[in-house]
Amino acid sequence: MIVVTKDLYTLRSWEGQDTESLTLHLNNKKIWDNCRDGLPHPYTKENARCFISQAREKTEISDFCIVVHGEAIGNIGFVRGADVERFNAEVGYWISERYWNQGITSEALADAIQYYFEHTEVIRIFATVYEYNLASMRVLEKVGFKKTGIFRKACYKNG
């Protein structure tokens, strides 16, 4: 399902044909360094097939494939809270290193957030960022996020 089409990119649901490009672009240590440990590295075709299969099984679209020139080059994903936090969602994203610093991530993120608000009952979206990932902080600020707190010594990546 296509969600948004712009000059620079398309946002859509993940498709089986995206396995090769997902594997190619996500098998990057620089990206892995900024994601949660649940993301395997190295990233294999089997990892990609499992991710795409799980994304397609969900009843509500929560993983948006970023497509440039017909190639899947990134993801914007939402994870809903449970119980009393069910109207909250955490957003996470990555884009192929080849497309860093081109403005695609912030524009696509804004579109994905708008779509998610319009098609779910979520009323609050938040994000967490490693303190060293200044580029991701700028992306979030561009789309209107405000820093509401700092979790000191709350998570560790690579030791």
Identify the meaning behind each predicted range.
Residues 1-20, 24-30, 63-159:
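Acyl-donor (CoA/ACP) binding surface of acyl/acetyltransferases
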Residues 9, 14, 49, 56-57:
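Bulky hydrophobic/aromatic packing residues
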Residues 53-65:
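A short helix-loop-beta-strand connector motif used in the catalytic cores of GNAT acetyltransferases and
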Residues 30-52:
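Conserved GNAT-fold acetyl-CoA-binding loop/helix
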